[in-house]
Amino acid sequence: QRAVEFGAEGIGLTRTEHMFFDERARDAVVRMILADTQEARDEALAEMLPIQEQDFEGLFEAMDGKPVIMRLIDPPMHEFLPPYHELIEEVAKLRVTKPDSDELAEKEKMLEIVSGMWETNPMMGLRGCRAGIMYEGLTEMQTRAYFQAACRCAKRGVDVHPEVMIPLVGHVNELKLEREKLEAVAEEVMEEEGVEVPAIFGTMIEVPRAAL
């Protein structure tokens, strides 16, 4: 609302990952990343959805009549987990103080996962659109929350202009895969809500490969 008062003409992109750093969602995000089964991942995503939807509703209401571009989750997944160097220190201490504890076993498991996620070139690694492809249900959840918020705001008379940015696309097939499934989610939500809203999907050319 403050941005509108200062003359903002819309939201160029919403960094949706900031919502995941919120204490309301942090535990569910970690469980989603660490899930061993799709069922466990879906349970975590179900907890994250209403938090995203609530935040999106606030954005649409504040930007009444102006475009709101939602950038789907962008950073590497390990950024939502404890830092590697902190885990190393904690594991080292626990091996001395609590060598046979469940706490040590949990920390060692987390350290193994975080180590496995380390990448030499994260910009082209498992993040952005590729995380959306590999973590089944993640970007579908975000898209559902976004269009549920848009439809429900529209029912209350808010003039919504939703747009979706698929991040870090390096190859046209990445865009095709994500766009196809997310457009289907948007259409499904509009059918469920009984209201039509604009549904624009695109990307930002932000890596050299995409430009070439």
Question: Predicted segment positions?
Answer:
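Conserved alpha/beta-domain cores
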Residues: Q1-L212
